[in-house]
A protein has these predicted regions:
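Sec/Tat signal peptide C-region and signal peptidase I cleavage site
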Residues: 33-37
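Extracytoplasmic "Venus flytrap"
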Residues: 39-67, 72-88, 96, 102-106, ...
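Periplasmic-binding protein-like
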Residues: 42-44, 95-103, 122-126, 167-170, ...
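Flexible loop/hinge segments that line or gate small-molecule binding clefts
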Residues: 70, 111-149, 256-264, 268-269
Length: 352
């Protein structure tokens, strides 16, 4: 019977993935007769102060409603990765039907994540980390934006605009994956990303002060890249106070009300949109569908998710376009500019 739940050899020949799915198939069978509401958890690396994650919280809530499951959200209040590892370990012992995690730091988290897969709990990784790391951890799939590629995409636009030196404002330097954004950008314009990156911390007043000081001390800087709303809003304030808003080239990752206003005013050239809603919604949809269909055939599961009327309605309403691969799903990058901001600002910070 377990064999009937597995994809045919010719449709999925990668033995590591087949082993993962065989393990989860057994777990599905063992739990098939248990009468309880399916329950999942998403554990992120984000501190409580990072409002960007509200979109993902909204996504898992709506996915739970659409698929009739319960989804919890857990995070380390201060963003401490040791705390995150403990949350993952706790989740492995809490009886969840599936676990969703960010790979904020592979080396720090691999032990804790290993406890999840050791108990044959289905795992999906999102947001931070690479597909290679996701596969090494035994995850079913990764849903996220290739960070280095996104940085390069931003760098190409900056280079075309004449940017030759830049400041990368990193408000979450505790996450090694964050530097991939800066590195990709720097490679395109031909500078050292380490010399161009500012560990700003996440306090708005401190970020504004540090950015202003850097630009005073490095007057030849002709571009600024911020890594999200937490660093973008204070940077916009710093540029406005120094009279450089709209004069010094600026771009950012992600969306918020302040960023939308900045794009419309010309202060921000574009926002790199990783469609975070997808990172929350799709993993819940996939895990719930696997459980409900009692199958680990990813092709069938993804087709079912794509065909789900409630899912289709959500994505159409919010203007979201995931890119489905054979195993992994890319949520971005997309670029929000003055030309298309009106299409997305209605839901910025909520569902975009």
């Amino acid at each position: 019977m377990i064999a009937s739940l597995l994809p045919a050899e010719d449709s999925m020949t990668a033995s590591p993935l087949r082993f993962i799915l065989k393990t989860f198939a057994l777990a599905l069978l063992l739990s098939a007769g248990v009468a309880h509401a399916d329950k999942y958890v998403l554990i992120s690396h984000a501190p409580d102060s990072d409002a960007w994650w509200n979109t993902i919280k909204n996504a898992i809530k709506q996915a739970g409603e659409d698929y009739g499951v319960q989804v919890d959200y857990r995070n380390p209040p201060s963003g401490d990765l040791a705390d995150m590892a403990r949350l993952i370990e706790q989740a492995s012992a809490a009886g969840y039907d599936g676990v969703i995690v960010t790979i904020a730091d592979y080396n720090v988290l691999q032990g804790a994540i290993g406890k999840v897969t050791a108990k044959k709990i289905p795992l999906i990784t999102i947001n931070s980390g690479t597909v290679e790391q996701s596969e090494k951890l035994g995850a079913i799939m990764h849903v996220g934006q290739p960070e280095h590629a996104a940085g390069k995409g931003a760098g190409e636009r900056a280079k075309a605009a004449g940017v030759k030196s830049f400041l990368c404002v990193n408000h979450y330097a505790t996450n090694p994956a964050s530097f991939e954004r800066c590195r990709g950008f720097a490679e395109v314009i031909g500078v050292d990303y380490k010399k161009s990156t500012l560990d700003s911390g996440d306090d708005p007043t401190t970020i504004e002060s540090k950015v202003a000081a850097y630009l005073r001390q490095n007057p030849n800087t002709n571009g600024v890249l911020t890594l999200g709303p937490t660093s973008a809003s204070p940077t916009i304030k710093a540029l406005e106070k120094s009279g450089q808003a709209g004069k010094l080239w600026m771009a950012t990752f992600d969306l918020s009300d302040d960023i939308s206003k900045g794009i419309k005013s010309g202060t921000v050239q574009f926002a790199i949109d990783q469609q975070p809603y997808l990172q929350g919604y799709i993993p819940v949809a996939v895990l719930a569908t696997m459980k409900q269909m009692k199958t680990t055939d990813l092709k069938k599961v993804m087709e079912a998710v794509k065909a789900n009327p409630k899912t289709q309605k959500r994505f159409a309403e919010y203007g979201l376009t995931p890119v489905y691969g054979d195993r992994h799903i890319s949520s971005g990058p997309g670029f929000v500019t003055k030309e298309n901001i009106s299409k997305v600002e209605k839901y910025a910070g909520q569902y975009r």
